[in-house]
Amino acid sequence: MYRILLPVDDDEDRARAQAAFVAGLPAADSDISVVVTHTLTSAEADAPEELRNVERVDTVKLVRDALDERGITVELAEARHPPAEGILDIAAEFEVDHVAMGSRQRSPAGKAIFGSVAQQVILKADVPVTVVGPTPD
């Protein structure tokens, strides 16, 4: 079975695009399993355990439900901070074959100043990484 990691943030449009990417792959409902992960913010990570459950994140629920409807096996995992390192750790832990990152529209200057989680994952991942853009309206 081909295992894909979907690291989602809090943006529902990006999460929908990531779910649509996976659902559109050949044999998605029979030969693909997905690990959905979310990196909790510092404040969320410091919250009591029952409040920092990744299943409470709206975009995680959205992706899980969308893929469940298509018959795609979904596992959930909580990534640690900083996001890129947490994503890479989850990729290694679950031995994924592919990572499908959501894309944020940011200027080149913004990327240079703030960095890009997707860029860090692309450069450091041991598996192929696809950057999924927003779905057309």
Question: Which ranges hold each PLM region?
Answer:
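Local beta-strand N-terminus motif with an aromatic residue
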Residues: 1-2, 31, 95-97, 118
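Structural beta-alpha unit
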Residues: 69-99, 137
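Gly/Ser-rich helix-loop-strand patches that form or flank binding pockets
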Residues: 98-137
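Short, well-ordered secondary-structure micro-motifs
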Residues: 16-18, 45-52, 88-89, 111-112
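General small-molecule cofactor/ligand-binding pocket signal
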Residues: 35-37, 75-79, 130
